[in-house]
Amino acid sequence: YPGVTNNICAPIIAKESKFNLNEGFYLGYSPERINPGDNKHSLDKIIKVISGSNNKITKIIGKIYETIITAGVFYAKSIEVAETAKAIENAQRDINIAFVNEVSLLCQKLNISVYDVLNAAKTKWNFLPFQPGLVGGHCIGVDPYYLAHIAKKLNSSSDVILSGRRLNDSMTGIVFKKIQKQIKKRSRLLQIGVTF
């Protein structure tokens, strides 16, 4: 979460190494942004956000990444800016999926297809095309809690972030109940998993 690198990692490294930050050691932070299985957005084709504990180390980190990242490098103003950017990228995705999940539940009650609704809505140029379903990956379901943690620490609101997370957490049970209704007694079931 925002502040971990400077407020947690740096003091531990300083204590264990007996060096001072930006004298005996430096810090850099660059969030992972790849999407496993996505060949279109491979490591070299995604803009790399980088940051460092001072301008000198940030430039060094940038030069290293510029040798492998064809999409370019974005120099964040600070490590905290880069950390927060990573957390909100994932929280935003989580919230958008929660919104579409909520719309899906409403469409069920309206006896209309959520996919018909989404197909109609995506004809507008600025509509964001998210699909209802479960949230996967190791970051999407966790980063909203990191943001909520730091928000609580700083006496700031995280109501929208946590609301989306609660809805998405409940979707596993909702999907399971839906499957149970569809399965008749003594039905044969083939379970196939897809993950990354």
Where are these regions (language model features)?
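Structural/interface elements that position substrates and couple domains in central-metabolism enzymes
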Residues: 1-196
